[in-house]
């Protein structure tokens, strides 16, 4: 994946530690690891026909500190409040270890090296210059758009900046990945016990599938868990990288996850020789790559970590070619997707920073109030809305439905005030919001605190008429479905 970027200067500083890249409209923070703490997020926009993920990052370590699907109970990388996120990101966030001639270095672990962060509307890039090792590391994050699975995309590029050939061994990934089915309460209060339910399947395929064996609820009935979290790493041509699911195979006796003892002492052969445990543990998701780089040459690891409701969805998704070109195409789409959303407020003045500010402000309104679209002839529906549950607002329990036409919960005040702009930017909405919010007024005259997802129902009589030409067995199933509350996303899934 070719990402154009400015080379960091060798003394570890750029002119101006904070600036706006006027061409890409990205915010650049040089030497971010030494700056005042900062927390933000990817917008969780995967397209109308895409599965969103939530992803939070900070200006420490490799940025991303927590991500998942839907809400905090479906985390893939554990959710932390901001102050803990700053402490933990360099240990439980993404890690990159590089071994050359028996010496091992961890990328983004030494703030004295030249490093920078580039923040886009739907992307995050970080870069570091390892002067002593004469290597440059570039990491790109973005959300997988317009697919049937929700995933965080991570692209790691290592460049040989020396004048000589280098033979490198690389270990990159997550030291801790939460299996599907483990909620936030279990992670915070009984992780040791919860490990007894955890398992990893399909490790040998290069696409490990993480889930609990059965439901963890303290009830008489036990239910099967079909959903799973997954990870996949590939090369430029699509060859799958070896996945490591047991952190002990890399860190050995260092249970603090600080030093990759096994990898440090014996390299990739030693890691592969370890017998990995695939159950009753809090697993990892690392990928291995060994390569020889000529002067100025680069190697790239393409990684995707996500969540699906069942294996069939994942298997169908993997039928397409997943390679460097796939990642490049999806990154480009992630960028154009948000550009299209904010096109209505595109502003051209003498101040490019002001122009970019208008777009970012408009995007902020979309994320809280939602983006209006028309369903059918006269139905107004808002996609992308959600409660602002970021790292510094840890009290909010946000939700982003993992389905097409995704929507979420919100505070009445936030949603109401952030839809005021639709009067100008989306006049087709008309009086819809007046009707919506006045109908939510309570008998005592007060408004409710929260606004939940919008659902639809169809009367029995109308449903019979709509599906009269459908085969009998399917007709009954569809009628039963639409006569109960449903979302557009679930209806799409039902009909697909």
What does each model-found stretch correspond to?
Residues 2-496:
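Anionic coordination/interaction segments
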């Amino acid at each position: 994946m070719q990402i154009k970027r400015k080379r960091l200067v060798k003394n570890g500083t750029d002119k101006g530690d904070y600036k706006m890249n006027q061409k890409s409209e990205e915010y650049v923070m040089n030497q971010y690891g030494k700056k005042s703490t900062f927390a933000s997020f990817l917008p969780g926009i995967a397209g109308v026909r895409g599965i969103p993920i939530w992803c939070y990052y900070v200006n420490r370590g490799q940025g991303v500190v927590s991500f998942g699907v839907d809400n905090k109970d479906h985390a893939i990388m554990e959710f932390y409040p901001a102050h803990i996120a700053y402490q933990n990101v360099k240990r439980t966030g993404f890690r990159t270890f590089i071994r050359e001639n028996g010496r091992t270095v961890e990328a983004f672990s030494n703030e004295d090296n030249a490093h920078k962060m580039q923040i886009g509307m739907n992307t995050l890039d970080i870069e570091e210059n390892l002067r002593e090792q004469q290597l440059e590391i570039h990491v790109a994050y973005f959300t997988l758009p317009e697919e049937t699975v929700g995933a965080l995309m991570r692209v790691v590029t290592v460049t040989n900046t020396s004048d000589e050939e280098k033979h490198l061994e690389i270990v990159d990934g997550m030291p801790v990945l939460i299996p599907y089915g483990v909620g936030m309460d279990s992670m915070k209060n009984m992780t040791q016990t919860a490990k007894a339910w955890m398992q990893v399947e399909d490790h040998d395929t290069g696409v490990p599938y993480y889930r609990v064996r059965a439901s963890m609820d303290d009830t008489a009935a036990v239910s099967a868990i079909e959903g799973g979290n997954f990870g996949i790493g590939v090369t430029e041509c699509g060859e799958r990288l070896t996945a490591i699911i047991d952190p002990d195979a890399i860190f050995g006796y260092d249970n603090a996850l600080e030093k990759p003892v096994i990898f440090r002492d014996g390299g990739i052969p030693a890691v592969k020789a370890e017998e990995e445990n695939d159950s009753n543990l809090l697993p990892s998701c690392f990928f291995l790559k060994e390569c020889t780089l000529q002067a100025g040459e680069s190697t790239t690891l393409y990684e995707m970590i996500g969540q699906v409701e069942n294996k069939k969805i994942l298997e169908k998704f993997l039928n397409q070619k997943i390679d460097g070109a796939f990642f490049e195409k999806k990154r480009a789409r992630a960028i154009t997707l948000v550009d299209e959303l904010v096109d209505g407020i595109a502003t051209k003045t003498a101040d490019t920073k002001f122009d970019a500010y208008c777009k970012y402000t408009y995007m902020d309104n979309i994320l809280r109030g939602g983006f209006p679209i028309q369903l059918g002839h006269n139905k107004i529906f808002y996609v992308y809305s959600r409660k602002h549950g970021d790292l510094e607002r840890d009290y909010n329990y946000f939700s982003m439905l993992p389905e097409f036409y995704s929507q979420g919960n919100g505070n009445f005040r936030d949603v109401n005030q952030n839809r005021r702009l639709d009067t100008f930017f989306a006049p087709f909405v008309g009086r819809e919001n007046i009707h919506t919010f006045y109908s939510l007024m309570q008998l005592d005259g007060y408004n409710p605190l929260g606004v939940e997802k919008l659902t639809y129902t169809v009367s029995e009589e109308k449903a019979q008429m709509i599906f009269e030409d459908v085969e009998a067995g399917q007709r009954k199933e569809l009628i039963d479905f639409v006569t109960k509350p449903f979302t557009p996303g679930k209806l799409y899934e039902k009909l697909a």
